[in-house]
């Protein structure tokens, strides 16, 4: 396999469980009077639907046409709306600077080599408004791999050679690396969830002109 379109075509509506800290995130967003939310790598739509239900103006992107199709269908079933766009998070985001009050991305951006992941983080910073919030989760454990065979093309990166995510690079974060790569954020929370993912809730620092 090796690409998300193949995964969604084969497995259908997957990754449906709401991330455990989303209630806290939503509460903080409402306290901030946030309106415009980017769901980066929306998959089949679990968080897009959740945020739309809460009344936010949601834009959702994903690299998979099938994932977006499922998201669109789910929104329609719930009589909700969101802006959907096919896009890879490792390419320049198709949005102007300072567009969003918050960016949400769960178990998405670590699926590439480190330089690509860092580019994605820089784009998250660009499209966020000053003091905007980001809730990002990434892989934390390089030993619990979803493959019996893999290669390690560069440090802290493995590529499964079999299984559902065959051919997809996975960059594995440490707490130190999280703080380094998200240095432009005031980190409000940084913890490991039950699924061995680093979960970061941060506020973009305002940079003096």
Residue ranges of each PLM-predicted region?
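Short acidic capping loops at alpha-helix termini that bridge into adjacent secondary structure
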Residues: 81-83, 98, 131
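Conserved beta-strand/loop positions that form the S-adenosyl-L-methionine
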Residues: 40
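A short His-aromatic
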Residues: 110-112
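A short acidic, Gly/Pro-enriched loop at the edge of an enzyme's catalytic core
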Residues: 93-102
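A short beta-strand submotif of the Rossmann-like class I SAM-dependent methyltransferase core
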Residues: 105-108
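Class I (Rossmann-like) S-adenosyl-L-methionine-dependent methyltransferase catalytic domain
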Residues: 1-34, 43-92, 116-119, 135-209
């Amino acid at each position: 396999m090796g690409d998300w379109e193949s995964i969604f075509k084969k497995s259908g509506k997957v990754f449906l469980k709401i991330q455990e800290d989303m209630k806290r995130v939503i509460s903080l967003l409402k306290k901030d009077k946030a309106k415009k939310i980017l769901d980066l790598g929306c998959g089949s739509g679990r968080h897009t639907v959740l945020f739309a239900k809460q009344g936010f103006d949601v834009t959702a992107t994903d690299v998979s046409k099938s994932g977006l199709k499922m998201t669109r269908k789910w929104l329609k079933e719930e009589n909700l709306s969101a802006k959907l766009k096919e896009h890879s998070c490792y390419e320049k985001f198709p949005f102007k600077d300072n567009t969003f009050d918050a960016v949400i991305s769960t178990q998405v951006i670590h699926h590439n080599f480190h330089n690509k992941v860092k580019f994605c983080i820089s784009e998250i910073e660009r499209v966020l408004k000053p003091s905007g919030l980001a809730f990002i989760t990434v892989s934390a454990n390089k030993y619990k791999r979803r493959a019996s065979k893999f290669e390690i093309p560069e440090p802290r990166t493995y590529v499964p050679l079999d299984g559902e995510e065959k051919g997809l690079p996975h960059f594995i974060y440490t707490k130190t690396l999280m703080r380094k790569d998200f240095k432009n954020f005031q980190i409000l929370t940084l913890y490991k969830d039950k699924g061995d993912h680093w979960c970061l809730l941060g506020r973009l620092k305002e940079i003096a002109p």
